[in-house]
From Swiss-Prot:
Disulfide bonds join C220-C229. The modification Phosphoserine is found at S224. The modification N-acetylthreonine is found at T2. Homodimer. Expressed in roots, cotyledons, hypocotyls, leaves, shoots, flowers, siliques and dry seeds. GO terms for biological process: defense response; oxylipin biosynthetic process. Ca(2+) binds at D74, D76, N78, E85. Heme binds at H69. It is found in: Lipid droplet. Residues 61-96 form the EF-hand domain. It comes from Arabidopsis thaliana (Mouse-ear cress). This is Peroxygenase 2.
Amino acid sequence: MTSMERMERDAMETVAPYARVTYHRRVRGDLDDTLPKPYLPRALQAPDMEHPQGTPDHRHNGLSVLQQHVAFFDLDNNGIIYPFETFSGFRLLGFNLLASLILAAGINIALSYATLPGWLPSPFFPIYIHNIHKAKHGSDSKTYDNEGRYTPANLELMFSKYARTIPDKLSLGELWDMTEGNRDAFDFFGWLASKVEWGVLYALASDEEGFLSKEAIRRCFDGSLFEYCAKNYAEIKEYKTYY
């Protein structure tokens, strides 16, 4: 092998011999086979290799993908999410009273100030959707960028790195490993927030075998999962009431 050939090979290598973590957490090199420009952050849609156009029939309404993610909880569609709306949103998803209360309090207290239009805090802890990108924490998957766009390659990397049992699903243990692998140094808030967020998603959308599917995660990013789960839960409640 010539020096030029070696340089060309090394330029595309994804595993470093003396960095074992690069061997255990593999990355894919075939993303652009079915997904155009996978490393390009998307502002309006959340595509993956199986859904290169994003979620069918999901309306973005001009919101960024991160804004779409939280818009489900804006029950009166005024662009502001108050704690009682967060609480009601979790109830619509099927969470019990105590869990909904704890999650609503924690989310609005943690995120409100960063999204406020001014410097003075609000005793009502509102979350302003147009500023939700300012509440993005560290130690996350980097699937959202700092402006609230969605990077499809980073969704795919979750599974190439951590899905060791089923290629397109993550077990609870694999989710834990992922949150550990995403930790930024001394980011204590981000460590906790990441584990809580993924734990809530696992409780909401894991299947009967204890796995969280890639499709559920993708649809969580654009918020369409919440609409789907709320509709299913409402139908179950109606069925139980009827019978």
